[in-house]
């Protein structure tokens, strides 16, 4: 019996061992099969993502979305329509692999699971671009071609505008969420995955940014012009020849009325036709940022100073109130739009050139900014004639933009506007709160930074010398990360440089209207009445004497603190023989609206001289890369360089 039992135990042991071996073999086989399936899936995804990126890169989609001119915009949409099916073939396969059980289970692995999760986000975003967003764009383009944004009588087709905006907006919102999630995903550990995602993210970021610009423009147009009933808008035309914080001094103002899609332009009035009014209620930003006003000298309501604050909603309210107090004004303004000379030039790329009524001047997409900011003061010396020229040019360009919006013009407009709003050449504001939400989301309202996690510092300039010399100012900036701090915040060093390129010879030969007409006597009397100390008055008087010299420009600088962050170590260096150190280096802390600024009285620049403002910024913990906002320049895009010296 014992012998028999022993044999049974031995047999059982053999069976158990064999079962273990079989189990191990099965597990190993399953693991090998899973690993093989994972490797195969990874190769498929890598190949399809790489090909998707190549299709987007080589197809000209980016150029189509960013192009200007009616022909290029339509050709771009045709290119998108042609390439979308090819792109979908690759993105659908990649997304199918990433959504399969093999890839999903790999996403749960410790450490490297994030690699697979990030890949799934990337394939989702690429497929959304190919299968949802691009078809929405081409569908919208086809809708505009068939129905048009303008009816046969030239009036705006409100139904088409809102329909097109809604289609693209929904797809864009999905894409932006996916791209944000992808950018927030941890960096992959596996080199092959990391390389594929790096290429894919760069392509997606570029396409998503351009698509967001198109969607934002359509949303903004729908918010302002897509209503039933009547809307009345004030139009500000700013001149970059005389810099103000939001762009340039307001040179002419007109109205635009939209009545169930029917657009009509009112008369434009030059700033010289405006009366100075008693102080208006919305002067906080203007009084605190315009240097003379900070000394206690109130200008009251002056339409030229509406742009002295970089917070355009406040500027719009100021302009609305000043307009209402003019003999030709009204109390029925629903919103305010603003265009500077760079914007007017870009819009002529949409509408085509115009020849002014004199027959002597043709404004084009190449010469308008220079002519309106500089040449006009040389060619037309009579101020009344200048005023008439500005009134006519602004009215005709803006009217040409909005009238007869066929598909070609509409597509060109939505391709042109994002760069203009991004760089503060165009602003849009409505006094309707529901519209404000749309416009703020679209990024067209021109506000200083409002989000601690997306920090923005600003450098804003108000010209104090009554000159038209800012066409000759060349500006550049650098933003360098210098440290990643223990609390998760980051420190940056900002450098902002301005050079007066006007030569000493030009300062004596150019018209005085350009080189300066500073009213020394009047301003001296105003300063005497101010609350400044005797020492301050002496420094200010010295500055005003310098501003009376031809070609000397005075820039009051306001630095905006990012929300949740701080600004420190502000310094100014200058080689200008007319500099007044006490006025350029003393930065007063002020608050206008919800923004904290540090502002000086003026940096004075002689012809050929340069000044540089430098300061440090600390962001809120765990914030994104610091961005620099600034008063728009004479170029479409500001010259800003971002570097990272903290790593």
Residues covered by each model-derived region:
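Non-catalytic, solvent-exposed segments at the cell envelope interface
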Residues: 2-24, 34-638, 647
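Acidic, glycine-rich low-complexity segments
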Residues: 642
């Amino acid at each position: 019996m014992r012998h028999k039992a022993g044999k049974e135990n031995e047999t059982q042991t053999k069976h158990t061992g064999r079962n273990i071996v079989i189990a191990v073999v099965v597990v190993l086989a399953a693991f090998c099969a899973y690993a093989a399936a994972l490797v195969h899936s990874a190769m498929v995804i890598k190949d399809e993502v790489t090909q998707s990126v190549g299709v987007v890169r080589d197809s000209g989609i980016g150029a189509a979305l960013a192009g200007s001119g009616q022909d290029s915009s339509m050709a771009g949409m045709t290119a998108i329509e042609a390439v979308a099916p090819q792109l979908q073939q690759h993105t659908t396969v990649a997304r199918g692999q990433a959504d399969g059980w093999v890839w999903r289970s790999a996403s749960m692995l410790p450490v490297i699971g994030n690699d697979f999760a990030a890949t799934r986000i990337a394939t989702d975003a690429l497929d959304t671009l190919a299968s949802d967003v691009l078809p929405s764009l081409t569908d919208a383009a086809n809708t505009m071609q068939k129905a048009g944004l303008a009816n046969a009588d030239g009036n705006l087709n409100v139904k088409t505008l809102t329909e097109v905006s809604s289609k693209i907006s929904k797809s864009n919102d999905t894409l932006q969420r996916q791209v944000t999630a992808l950018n927030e995903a941890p960096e992959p550990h596996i080199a092959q995955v990391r390389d594929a995602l790096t290429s894919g993210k760069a392509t997606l970021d570029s396409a998503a940014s351009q698509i967001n610009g198109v969607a934002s423009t359509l949303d903004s147009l729908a918010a302002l012009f897509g209503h039933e009933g009547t809307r009345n808008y004030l139009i500000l035309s700013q001149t970059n020849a005389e810099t103000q914080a939001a762009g340039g001094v307001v040179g002419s103002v007109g109205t635009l009325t939209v009545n169930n899609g029917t657009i009509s332009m009112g008369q434009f009035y030059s700033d010289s036709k405006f009366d100075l009014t008693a102080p208006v209620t919305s002067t906080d930003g203007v009084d605190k940022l315009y240097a003379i006003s900070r000394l206690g000298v109130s200008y009251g309501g002056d339409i030229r100073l509406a742009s002295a604050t970089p917070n355009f909603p406040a500027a719009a309210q100021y302009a609305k109130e000043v307009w209402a107090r003019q003999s030709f004004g009204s109390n029925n303004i629903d919103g305010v739009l603003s265009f500077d000379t760079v914007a007017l030039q870009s819009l002529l790329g949409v509408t085509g050139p115009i020849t002014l009524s004199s027959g002597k001047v043709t404004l084009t997409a190449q010469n308008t900014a220079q002519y309106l900011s500089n040449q006009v003061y040389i060619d037309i010396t009579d101020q009344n004639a200048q005023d008439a020229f500005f009134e006519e040019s602004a009215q005709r360009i803006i009217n040409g933009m909005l009238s007869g919006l066929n598909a070609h013009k509409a597509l060109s407009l939505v391709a042109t506007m994002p760069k203009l709003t991004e760089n503060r050449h165009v602003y849009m504001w409505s006094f309707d709160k529901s519209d404000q939400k749309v416009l703020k989301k679209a990024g067209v309202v021109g506000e200083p930074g409002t989000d601690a996690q997306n920090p923005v510092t600003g450098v804003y300039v108000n010209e104090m010398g009554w000159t038209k010399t800012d066409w000759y100012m060349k500006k550049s900036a650098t933003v360098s990360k210098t440290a990643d701090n223990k609390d998760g915040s980051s420190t940056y060093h900002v450098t902002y440089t301005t050079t007066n390129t006007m030569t000493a010879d030009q300062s004596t030969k150019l018209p005085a209207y350009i080189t300066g007409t500073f009213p020394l006597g009047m301003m001296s009397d105003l300063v005497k009445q101010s609350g400044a100390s005797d020492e301050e008055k002496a420094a200010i008087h010295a500055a005003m004497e310098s501003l009376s010299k031809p070609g000397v420009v005075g820039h009051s600088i306001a630095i905006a603190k990012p929300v949740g962050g701080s600004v420190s170590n502000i310094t100014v260096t200058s080689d200008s023989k007319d500099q007044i150190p006490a006025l350029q280096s003393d930065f007063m802390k002020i608050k206008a609206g919800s923004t904290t600024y540090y502002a000086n009285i003026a940096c004075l620049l002689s012809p050929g001289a340069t000044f540089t403002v430098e300061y440090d910024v600390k962001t809120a913990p765990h914030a994104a890369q610091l961005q620099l906002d600034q008063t728009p320049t004479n170029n479409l895009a500001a010259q800003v360089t971002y570097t990272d010296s903290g790593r």
